[in-house]
Amino acid sequence: MATERQYSPLDRLLLQADSAMRTLLPSSAHSQRPSPAVVQPEHKMSEADTRHVAGLMRINHTGEVCAQALYQGQALTAKLPKVRKAMERAAEEEIDHLVWCEQRIHQLGSHTSVLNPLFYSLSFGMGAVAGVISDRVSLGFVAATEDQVCKHLAEHLEQLPTEDGKSRAILQQMLSDEEHHAESALEAGGFRFPAPVKFGMSVLAKVMTKSTYRI
């Protein structure tokens, strides 16, 4: 029976550095699943609608950058191996979303946010701190974060132009995946954060969405 490889602290730091580079460097990550947008036709939109959709997708891309950093930070400090594995697996699944959003942004003739390195660093730090406190808090933080992401996705789906089936297909699949991640974190023993904490997280999320819509 094969034994699981044991990584040293240096190994884990190098793996985190590799993950950060794949997350932040353009076109360096690769999805496991094809984008839901590939089966949708491209319909012409007005210039204003195209700019607006690009801004929404840029927000969602940065949200996935934050998710990657959050999971990687938690995986670095998680106490139980099964929790660490769960965080690493969730990060891998989020890569699909990251790639899909980046592809759509480029199709719309726009760019990803220049603020991504800043938000990656902040999210990684918060994830690592949550992991140090306890695995229950770490899992609860995942659930609360995914709840915020789901709210943004639902709002963005309402704002999309009717003719933009490509972006809609991507966001619908992302919403389904994120709801599953939130449920899984709670089922694994995650702590349900109280309303004041969730409110504070929503304020931070608004800072991210307002700043990355254009830059």
From Swiss-Prot:
Recorded hits in InterPro entries, A to Z, give: COQ7_proteobact, Ferritin-like, Ferritin-like_SF, Ubq_synth_Coq7
Q: What is its EC number?
A: 1.14.99.60
Q: Which UniProt keywords apply?
A: Cell membrane, Iron, Membrane, Metal-binding, Monooxygenase, Oxidoreductase, Ubiquinone biosynthesis
What domain of life does the native source organism fall in? Bacteria
- Its main localization is membrane
**Single GO cellular component term:** plasma membrane
Residues that hold Fe cation 2 according to the record: 94, 146, 178, 181
* Gene3D superfamilies cross-referenced by the UniProt entry: 1.20.1260.10
GO molecular function terms here? 3-demethoxyubiquinol 3-hydroxylase activity; metal ion binding
Example GO biological process: ubiquinone biosynthetic process
Entry's localization field: Cell membrane
Pathway annotation from the record: Cofactor biosynthesis; ubiquinone biosynthesis
Q: How does it sit in the membrane?
A: Peripheral membrane protein
Q: Which PANTHER family does the record cross-reference, listed alphabetically?
A: 5-DEMETHOXYUBIQUINONE HYDROXYLASE, MITOCHONDRIAL (PTHR11237:SF4), COENZYME Q10 BIOSYNTHESIS PROTEIN 7 (PTHR11237)
The record's similarity note reads: Belongs to the COQ7 family.
Output this protein's name: 3-demethoxyubiquinol 3-hydroxylase
